[in-house]
Amino acid sequence: MEIQFKDGLVPVIVQERRNRDVLMLAYANAEALELTRTTGYAHYYSRSRQKLWKKGEESGHVQRICRILVDCDEDAILYEVEQTGAACHTGHASCFYRTVEGEEIAGLVFDPEKVYANKGE
């Protein structure tokens, strides 16, 4: 299988294995994908910070990998995970917690000000 990286990155959709909720969309480069495969925990590449990161490295809200799938065009990845805590840095279980009209449809799982205090997030 030959993953199609565009500009060195591939989009990664993240889904909770237990209830199939979509948790987030992120990007991985080849190194992040390899770290994910070898460690069993989700790693990504931050486009804004230009660096690798392990999900939960600061918050403790890690994503344990259950399975990694690739789409039919081999240009997108799906991580099926068991999420510890919340996936979104805003404190929501999923990054998809509001409608396009701005209505919040899910409450906070944690207080991000407490979790990321003094960590620069």
Curated annotation (Swiss-Prot):
It comes from Methanoculleus marisnigri (strain ATCC 35101 / DSM 1498 / JR1). Mg(2+) binds at D71, D73, D75. Its cofactor is Mg(2+); Zn(2+). SUPFAM superfamilies: HisI-like. Belongs to the PRA-CH family. It is an enzyme of class 3 (hydrolase). This is Phosphoribosyl-AMP cyclohydrolase. GO terms for cellular component: cytoplasm. The keyword Hydrolase applies. Keywords: Amino-acid biosynthesis, Cytoplasm, Histidine biosynthesis, Hydrolase, Magnesium, Metal-binding, Zinc. Homodimer.
